[in-house]
Amino acid sequence: MPTPESAAFLAKKPTVPPTFDGVDYNDTKRLKQAQDAIIREQWVRVMMGRLVREELSKCYYREGVNHLEKCGHLRERYLQLLSENRVQGYLFEQQNHFANQPKQ
């Protein structure tokens, strides 16, 4: 069962998507919200990788000599998350932003 979200948490939860689409760069409040949302999403992915790493270490300890065959799925998932999910920041995306254009 998911943990209920408090009013204080909901007040700080971002209301903008983690992208610069539709953000007016002169509106500093909306720009900062978009930056925070992007950083937050990157950290969520990093923390997901950390959780998989913790489960992998528990599996290695639990399985002992059979860890190579018993923990393979966690190892593959962790290596995939490790290569994809890094905190990169928002500056490159902000400075090189191209609006989504329809494909022709």
Swiss-Prot record:
Major site of localization recorded for this protein: mitochondrion
Record bears the keyword Ribonucleoprotein: no
Coiled-coil region list: none
Compartment(s) where it occurs, according to its Swiss-Prot or TrEMBL record: Mitochondrion inner membrane
Signal peptide positions are: none
Q: How does it sit in the membrane?
A: Peripheral membrane protein
Q: Respond yes or no to whether keyword Electron transport is given for this record.
A: yes
Q: What does this protein's UniProt record list under function?
A: Accessory subunit of the mitochondrial membrane respiratory chain NADH dehydrogenase (Complex I), that is believed not to be involved in catalysis. Complex I functions in the transfer of electrons from NADH to the respiratory chain. The immediate electron acceptor for the enzyme is believed to be ubiquinone.
Q: Which family does it belong to?
A: Belongs to the complex I NDUFS6 subunit family.
Q: Assembly state and interactors?
A: Complex I is composed of about 40 different subunits.
Q: What is this protein called?
A: NADH-ubiquinone oxidoreductase 12 kDa subunit, mitochondrial
